[in-house]
Design a protein with these regions (language model features):
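N-terminal subdomain of nucleotide-sugar transferases
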Residues: 1-66, 253, 258
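Carbohydrate-associated surface elements
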Residues: 44, 182, 202-205
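A short helix/loop element that forms part of the nucleotide-sugar donor recognition site in Leloir-type
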Residues: 56-60, 212-229
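An aromatic- and histidine-rich active-site surface loop
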Residues: 86, 90-102, 109-133, 137-140, ...
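Membrane-proximal helix-turn-helix segments that form the acceptor-binding/catalytic region
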Residues: 119, 126-130, 156-178
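Conserved donor-binding/catalytic core segment of Leloir-type glycosyltransferases
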Residues: 223, 230-246, 252-256
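Nucleotide-sugar-dependent
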Residues: 246, 310-320, 327-349, 353-354
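Nucleotide-activated donor-binding/catalytic signature segment of Leloir-type glycosyltransferases, i.e.
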Residues: 267-268, 276-279, 285-286, 291-318
Length: 354
């Protein structure tokens, strides 16, 4: 067998961070090792905004995880609800990743994702030029379309420049990957079906050996329920990023109709009950830019049957997902064709209704 081809992956987040794209890229990177020499460039573990002291002293950290070479870029801590701190964090990764790529040596391929928005694509383009390599651009979310859909920015000039920049990244790619059929249509619409870049569709996934259905009496599932007060409850769960793109603020306002003390046929003073007598509770597992708003709203309106649980380690994801009786998989209005909710794969993995 000849020498392996080399591929450089700009991941933004990577294991052990709990970001869904980081977990997917870990699976991908490790799955490519038989045929490729794989190097990943990412931030130091910091998805929650805080950083361990051991990752605060050097500019770059060189590691290896399960055969994958990793160059971690030091970035400043941030607060997900603070735009300025997030921008500083993202720019630190962008410029740090460019510097890290020079330390990655010769590469045959550069693989990048659409995160951070726009800049992820530009990392791929600049990495391609720097390495004289072929570029693969995996679009998990289309921007500025996503930014427009949630009203994050209404500055027409900024949005126009974002579109020009990301279309440039698409055109410079040797292959564009989208993660859903609707995203393919969005790509076609961007270019009005003319001079389309070469593209293919590859869905995201879940490892069915790691996330699968468990019986209700599984000890670890019961331990999770006990830890968070979910015993003998009917659990309606949202698990994932509690961010802008899911309209969770409106969802929580609807839950006002189901709080304890609300009386309606089939809904008792203790709160809504199932036919077998279990109290219905609404559980949000994760973190994100709107989490604090949701917590404040539920406290203000005395929601006693809404529970917030921190992100779970990937090893524990199987237990938290199995603890839900029904799962929400929601997107904000306008997100169709712009983003594909990868959380659906975990829900299907444990065999729960959506």
């Amino acid at each position: 067998m000849g020498e392996k081809k080399k591929i450089l992956i700009f991941a933004h987040y990577y294991a052990p961070d709990t970001a869904s794209t980081g977990q997917i890229l870990k699976d991908q990177a490790e799955g490519m090792l038989e045929e490729f020499d794989v190097t990943v460039i990412c931030v130091v573990p910091s998805y929650g905004g805080t950083i361990e002291d051991r990752y605060k002293t050097k500019k770059y950290y060189f590691e290896e995880l399960n055969g994958v070479k990793i160059i971690r870029v030091r970035v400043p801590e941030f607060t997900k609800s603070n735009k300025i701190s997030r921008v500083k964090n993202i720019l630190a990764y962008f410029f740090g990743a460019l510097g890290a790529s020079r330390k990655a040596g010769k590469q045959d391929y550069v693989f990048t994702i659409s995160q951070p928005p726009i800049l992820g694509g530009w990392l791929g383009v600049l990495g391609k030029w720097q390495k004289h390599a072929k570029m693969i651009y995996c679009i998990q979310d289309f921007n500025p379309e996503q930014t427009i859909a949630v009203g994050y920015s209404k500055n027409r000039l900024v949005l126009k420049l974002m579109m020009i920049a990301d279309k440039f990244s698409c055109r410079r790619s040797n292959l564009v990957i989208t993660v859903g059929r609707d995203l393919v249509e969005t790509l076609k619409n961007r270019f009005k079906n003319k001079n389309l870049p070469k593209y293919t569709m590859i869905n995201n996934w879940i490892d069915e050996k790691e996330v699968y259905p468990l019986p209700e009496d599984n000890e670890d599932v019961l331990a999770f329920k006990k830890k968070y007060g979910l015993e003998n409850k009917f659990v309606i769960m949202y698990s994932g990023n509690i961010g802008l793109y899911y309209d969770l603020e409106k969802l929580v306002k609807v839950l006002k109709q189901f709080r304890k003390g609300y009386t309606l046929k089939g809904v008792y003073e203790s709160g809504p009950l199932t036919t077998d007598g279990r109290e219905v509770v609404f559980v949000f597992v994760g973190a994100g830019s709107v989490l604090d708003k949701l917590v404040m709203y539920t406290k203000k309106h005395h929601f006693e049957n809404v529970i917030f649980i921190p992100y779970q380690d990937k090893a524990d994801l199987i237990y938290s997902l199995n603890a839900g009786d029904v799962h929400w998989c929601v997107n904000a209005k306008g997100i169709k064709g712009v983003s594909c909710p990868s959380k659906v794969y975990g829900i299907m993995g444990v065999g729960k209704p959506i």
